[in-house]
């Protein structure tokens, strides 16, 4: 059996370097996620948050900026929609994001940079209100 030539601490870090999302991304998804992360940096996301943001974006939308998830009640009626990269819920957040000056209409959440700005505001909202940073994505993130 061949032993690793890397010291155990370095080996452990190298195994952590690939996020869960990156491990399961198709090449096309990886290109989309790379683009999303580039845009996230442009709109003010901190470098330390980018690996987990990538995980969230891949998990929520497969890094598709025009992704729409429909939430339905027990009769099948659509009650709300989750929009864009970060799948921001229109029913929960449109009014707040309008009041913050981030969007003018719900459909603005389908614009890549706007969606990422809105997601950053939701992360900041969580921190301001004493929640875990990634609280808005707790159903998917496992955090």
Region annotations inferred by a language model:
Residues 52-53, 81-143:
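Catalytic and binding regions of secreted/periplasmic enzymes and modules that target cell-wall glycans
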Residues 37-41, 72, 103:
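Generic preference for well-ordered secondary structure
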Residues 61-68, 126-131:
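Secretory-pathway/luminal and periplasmic proteins that interact with or process carbohydrate-rich
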């Amino acid at each position: 059996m061949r032993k690793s030539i890397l010291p155990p601490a370095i080996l452990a870090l190298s195994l952590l370097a690939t996020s869960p999302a990156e491990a399961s991304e198709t090449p096309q998804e990886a290109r989309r996620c790379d683009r999303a992360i580039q845009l996230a940096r442009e709109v003010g996301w901190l470098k330390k948050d980018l690996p987990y943001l990538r995980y969230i974006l891949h998990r929520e939308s497969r890094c598709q900026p025009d992704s729409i998830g429909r939430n339905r009640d027990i009769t099948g009626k659509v009650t709300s929609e989750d929009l864009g990269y970060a799948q921001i819920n229109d029913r929960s957040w449109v009014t707040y994001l309008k009041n913050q000056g981030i969007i003018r209409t719900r459909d603005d959440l389908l614009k890549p940079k706007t969606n990422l700005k809105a997601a950053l505001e939701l992360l900041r909202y969580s921190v301001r209100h004493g929640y875990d940073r990634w609280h808005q994505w707790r159903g998917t993130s496992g955090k």
